[in-house]
Amino acid sequence: MSEKKYTFETEVDKLLHLVIHSLYSNREIFLRELVSNSSDAIEKLRYESISNAALNEDDTDYAIRIDFDKDAKTITVSDNGIGMTEEEVIENLGTIAKSGTKKFLESLTGDKSKDNELIGQFGVGFYSSFIVADKVTVRTRKAGQDKSQATKWVSDAQNGFTVETITKEKRGTEITLHIKEDQLDLLDYHLLKSLVNKYSDCINTPIQMKKVEHDKDGKQIIKDEYETVNNTKAIWLRSKDEVTDEEYQEFYKYISHDFADALMWIHNKVEGNLEYNSLLYIPQNKPFDFWNRDKDYGLSLYVRRVFIMENKELLPPYLRFVKGVIDSADLPLNVSREILQHNKVIDKIKKAITTKILSELKKLASKDTEKYQKFWDSFGQVLKEGVSDDYSNKEKIAGLLRFATTESGDAKQTVSLADYVSRMKEGQDTIYYITSDSYKAAVNNPQLEAFKKKGIEVILMTDRIDEWMMSTLTEFDGKHMKSIIKGDIDLDKFETPENKEKFEKEAKDFEKVLKEIKEVLKDKVEDVRLSKRLTDSPSCVVVNDYGMSLHMQKMMEEAGQGFMPGMGMKPILELNAEHNLVQKLKNEADTEIFADLSELLLLQAMFVEGAKIEDPMAFVKLVNKYIR
């Protein structure tokens, strides 16, 4: 039959131009789209042949084949799927917005749709061929049609398309791309195979290419025998009982490119209003560029086993260490598949998998403390970001936190907040903590002295994230969380009546000298008072309850962030009334020595806190002046 010419439907020429030049930024996608369509056609035949076995035409070895011809400058993708009639060819390939598979899906009702493994909601995927080809030829025959009733479709995307009736022995569709001159590098076995592995490795149907061997000179020799080039089964769609630990670990290494085994995995199938499968992994070790929050991270998104995109933020940033896949047909995709539309379905999936991960981490922490400790050592700091970033899950995340304390014995972060609460002293209703640059600086901080003497455990927070985290985490299990370097510390309930009376007497005795010290240091401190924190050291500095700690001020300065008015607050100087240096100051009559000692007590307290000393040389001279 002679060929018939058609023009594309309204505005299709413009849309084709958009697809070719703007819609897809990555040329590689063309192969993903064609393989996806072939898989779609095979899945449709697989479904329809259940009720009409004759459609298989005694051929149930479903396969997708990719061939290339360097001389002809062509790439051909073929399948033995359902195929198309001439009418379907004109409708589906002549109109951007229509998809035969989408119409097919809409015609299904009830539970049958659950058995149908289709992915055809994209409408324009076929036209991505024109990114790399200046002409496309389609040969197709509908399953069940006579061999002489096949259809040939040809277009250059510029002048409409032609259709003619041809003879085709085998059912299914064959798409031949006539490759553009500037895309001829695609005519390579290894490149095409790598694209299959990257985008379509988990297609349920075998994807085949002719075997390639090399002669003694290294020249490629293409054999007539086909081999399957997609390697990975969609294990996330299988029952957990059907997957071995070895298979789980092999798949993890494939998707993560990690040499080590995963620490744990979470395999989950969700059914109901929202249906999806997920297979999530937590690595053993963090990658070298882990702290780059701008780096792509997250899960590989599949729709019915077809890879859509990688590193899509289906996870909150504080779970960016999680690897794995999400596979769902409920996700809406825009016309290019490149950008997920932000809607309620996506939000629900993100919320659900976040909850699942936190729940599984909680189980791990209770069942296998050694393995959880390994997780915490690798990813604890980034998990802390969630306390501030994810208000709805703040309590769950708080329960997963681990810290060193004054009772834990070393810098290893092993103590949970629940552990701390379980061993609080009788009458204690506050969780005490201190933030510092390092474990040694924290555990030796003078402000711990009274707590150590009274046997009150204090959490030692030494990660840079801790200051920001604690601005949000103000209580746990109904217990207020209190920084011991801020505001007043009320330990009166743990004091004897004699000590309380003694402190009140000292406060009266020092009332005059405290005012004099404050006058000397008036430009440098907010206040001067006697300390309930100190037992051995002469002085320390604190800020008020709502002030920015000296540790935080230091970190902000190091980060190059200046202070708004009122943010960089003056410290409060606290003195130990029983220390001999403070007693000497109290009794000092020489105004110069009095001023020097006042300055020295402030500077050494600032130094211990790691605060910035504006004039280090002046500090050294002052110390040297009084060394005897």
Swiss-Prot record:
Q: Does the keyword Cytoplasm apply?
A: yes
Question: Keyword Chaperone, does the record have it?
Answer: yes
The record's region (B) falls at: 338-554
Give positions of region: C. Answer: 555-628
Q: Which UniProt keywords apply?
A: ATP-binding, Chaperone, Cytoplasm, Nucleotide-binding, Stress response
| GO molecular function per UniProt | ATP binding; ATP hydrolysis activity; ATP-dependent protein folding chaperone; unfolded protein binding
Gene Ontology cellular component annotations, sorted alphabetically: cytoplasm
InterPro entries, per this entry?
A: HATPase_C_sf, Heat_shock_protein_90_CS, HSP90_C, Hsp90_fam, Hsp90_N, Ribosomal_Su5_D2-typ_SF
Region spans: A: 1-337
Major site of localization recorded for this protein = cytoplasm
Family note: Belongs to the heat shock protein 90 family.
Task: Please give the subunit comment from the record.
Answer: Homodimer.
Q: Which HAMAP family match?
A: HSP90
What NCBIfam families is this protein classified in? PRK05218.1
Stated name of the protein: Chaperone protein HtpG
Q: Which organism is it from?
A: Francisella philomiragia subsp. philomiragia (strain ATCC 25017 / CCUG 19701 / FSC 153 / O#319-036)
